[in-house]
Amino acid sequence: MLTVVTSTLHLYREALHATSRSLVRGWLAIPAVIVFTLLMLLAHQIARPLGMLGGFLLGAVNACLIGAILSLIEQAIKGMRAITLGDVIESMGHYFWDVRSVGCVLWIPTLRLDTSLRANPDSQFLVTACLLLVFILLNPAPEVIYLTRHDSPLDVLKRSYDFVLDNWIEWFLPMALVLAPLGLSLFFKLSSQLGRGAGLDFIQLVFVPFTVLSAWLTDFGISAELTGMIALLLTPPLMVGMLIFRGHLFVALSATSRRQRLYQSQFHDSAR
């Protein structure tokens, strides 16, 4: 049991060290997140009176921005040089069809869930359970898109599912440690929102670190006004750091099995 704990801690320590190095290279992704968020909010204002056409517009803008941020995170993780303004501009359009196609696959079942909820408000528990299941099984979909070779949106979903089955403890433990003190209600709120798009909704990606950080600051007794200011200021770097950490953790978990990590941990401890 001690060996399991040691190997897991070593895994997270290495991922955190790699994250810090990637943040130095990819710090420009932080102001990019701010600009992308403003663009997404502008798109919402433009799309609001356009009905169904506005929905298609929002989907396209979301796919463009999600693909761009995933491209920047990929460069921060894999690259050997600092990200430049040119990289930010060139990132627009990357992974557009990957994000759009996965979103289309999930759109119909999500629409049916919403229709069911409107027709029968008592089905709230069933809808929440379904979205929780999607949130869990498709949680690594963003990392699958930019860190693996895949043939189709269904392949992305299958690879996400397989990854979670193999690595669910190590993958979800950091999230559990962060959210556990804040209560189950916040967890179910976040899972219901993220489950709708498999983590590929840009506004939700911004919303998660903002909400979690706000909850932590509130628990520490900080006033609502100061909490809002601090959360707004720290959300972009927290979002980028979270995505980079997830990417490094995904790479580490995909490259080795749990048994291999246990063996490597024993070798690492004996070498110290």
Identify the meaning behind each predicted range:
Residues 1-272:
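Hydrophobic alpha-helical membrane segments
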